[in-house]
Amino acid sequence: GKLDTRVKGIPVVLYNASGFKATDVVTIEVEASRFPKSVAVYNEQGKLVVSQLVSYTDGKVRLLVEATVPANGYAVYDVRLSGEGKEMSAVEAASVENSFYKLTLNENGDITSLFDKRINKELVKAGKAIRLALFTENKSFEWPAWEILKETVDATPISITEDVKVTLCENGALRKTLCVEKRHDDSFFRQYIHLYEGVLAHRIDFTNEVDWQSTNALLKAEFPLNLNNEVATYDLGVGSVQRGNNILTAYEVYAQYWADLTDANGSYGVSIMNDSKYGWDKPDNNTLRLTLLHTPKTKKNYAYQDRQDFGHHTFTYSLVGHVGALDVVQTRENAELLNQRIKAFVVGKHRGELGKSYSLAFSDNRNVLIKALKKAESSDEYVVRVYEAAGKQAQKASIVFADNLVAAVEADGTEKTIGKATFSGNRLEVSVNPNSIKTYKVRFASNKKVQTVAEPLPLVYDKKCFSWNEFKAAANFESGYSYAAELIPAEMNVHGVPFKLETREELNGMACKGNVLKLPADCTYNRLYILAAAASDKDVKGIFRVGKYVQEVIVPSYTGFIGQWGHTGHTEGYLKDAEVAYVGTHRHSGEGDQPYEFTYMFKFAIDLPEKATEVVLPDNKDIVIFAATLTDVAATSVCPASELFRTANKCNRYQTESSTERVNILKQDMVMGYSSYVNEKEKPAFMVDGDENTKWCAIAEMPHYVDFDLGGERSINGWKLLNAAGENHSYVTSSCFLQGKSDKNGEWRTLDYVSGNGKNVLNRTLNKSESVRYLRLLVTQPMQSASGKDVRIYEMEVYE
């Protein structure tokens, strides 16, 4: 709240995370009751800037603003909406132009002409087209996900020509946009071709939305250019490299943000930038191709990868034409801006000592770019990382900060001090060799920490969650696993909120069972923060009650992934919208460390109304609280007004248990056969008795199996195993089959199988519903060790 956000209209704070002053066309969404007739936007100096209304959806107006924001800084803009208008209706079109370019499409929606008006030059090679190029043979039998074969890229790709539709969907002062829709078999493509005016007039953006369902296929963006050079330049992140045309040993090559083809005579060039793709090839002197999607044809090796890249994709690539030689520094800035867009936030109106614009740090030499600016991991210093961008000679620069410095040192990449640094006032003097990186740590003169008014709220701990290296089996947070105590600090500060954890006693977690947290007498705090996680391999829901106020939260699992890519038939893409407070690099089991089995704690905020006396916790024992802190939070309003994090998922989702409780159809009297068991207390029937404290145990020769008669045809959709990690992780079933049949005398057929499992709780969903009367659990590797022969399963469930 230190910026001055007092404006006439809607205050919008713009944030530029790049290390240079950035001017960009920013997309902003603000709430409105209707689509307005007009919009006026003013910068931090009160000057009118160019803006454009785009659309109205779900009570929000989307608009474009040409904005300038200082390096590593903020600017307050004033957005004013007025009147009531109508959105533009899309119209058929085959060309679009701005002050720099005229672009023409053919009947396939491919660009057959791109004319640079500045020097009257056609950029597309005669008889060719800038297009999405589809290779319809993509064999890769040995390493399918990793290797594209030269015979594939040597083939002639086709254009995508089915159901082509081209419309002009935007036609404003800042941006004009063609929307190209087309299809190839089951794959659908929507491409927005954006031409800008003003500061981005030199750049053409291609924003793509693809629903990809093409097998044995490779998709590239193809740029056949009216340029001639055997050599192209490719970005390496820090530095660049020149490469020639495709050869047998180098035909699919990598680059980070951009690649450039400049004519051999140096008169003109084209840079291709992108926000998420890294594979390129150059088949001839005129053409650059960017790899977009790769679904190989497979055989025995990694056969499942024949559906790789299936699903929904969003990505952007951009074209910039430049007169004269390649300016590497300018191209780096252009590409950085594409990848690190200016972010927008709608805020409340208030005074602020920092004014309406603020920059934390910038470089006074355009060849020395600030790559990172962050708090130090283990001190009160700040880390600034710079690199030399031109790649020609050593450079000196001053990094100018918003505050005076009292200390500065040179550091390595791990933030360890390695030498002295020169500074004076608010300037850090740096010297960097070509294409090199330097890291520094600085301490500011006014290095005052913002103190949060806070008080820890005592908890009644009843669960052993953390275990030490010497006693890894002493705790059982979930299924025999525990947090690694040696990683957990006694105190933690999470985004300004302090927490105190119990790290000395055996009990260090509080399971939620509808219990009550009493607030201090005459409590004046207005918010309760908690650290919590779900003692489950799934995310769980819980309801907190404060008087008549009810707040539902989703508490993510303590382990697993925060997000993952989807792979059709195997995994579902997701990204959990949760505030991660703690990450542990491994967890403990009874038999030792489990590296890369990450553990988490999450921060949640519970608002407290005036005169609140208690908080009723959820009635869900899988929600475990580790610490709680009462705070007095100033009323502030900050809402994202632009996309903060781009994901290919159409929506973010938690991996929660189904809202409809699943019923296990297996009963003890359904057991009709088995391989063996140890004793009367460990018979197969105890695996389906609903008691997690009893089990089926067998130690005879393999394979182990249990057969069930369901009493009639049932439609099976999923199943679950609870293994024996509570005894020892080595007892977790590694490989097994779920088999079924309808005829008692028929052959068993496999409904699902698991190989290399390490999870104690195994939840499976079948690819399709299977109708059977008889089921068999066939265990082929009952332990983590391939030589282990003993099976121990506490519960088995099967669902319709």
What are these regions, as identified by a protein language model?
Residues 4, 8-456:
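C-terminal (or distal) subdomains of carbohydrate-active enzymes
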Residues 15-18, 32, 196-198, 374-376, ...:
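Extracellular and analogous surface-interaction loops
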Residues 63-67, 429-430, 439-441, 517-518, ...:
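Exposed aromatic-hydrophobic patches
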Residues 181-187, 295-297, 362-364, 387, ...:
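Extracellular beta-rich ligand/substrate-recognition surface
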Residues 222-225, 398-403, 540-549, 729-744:
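Short, surface-exposed beta-strand/strand-loop-strand elements in extracellular ectodomains
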Residues 447-660:
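N-terminal/edge-of-domain interface segments
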Residues 517-525, 533-538, 622-657, 682-750, ...:
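Aromatic, loop-rich ligand-recognition surfaces of beta-strand-rich domains
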Residues 559-569, 653-689:
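Predominantly extracellular/luminal regions of secreted and cell-surface proteins
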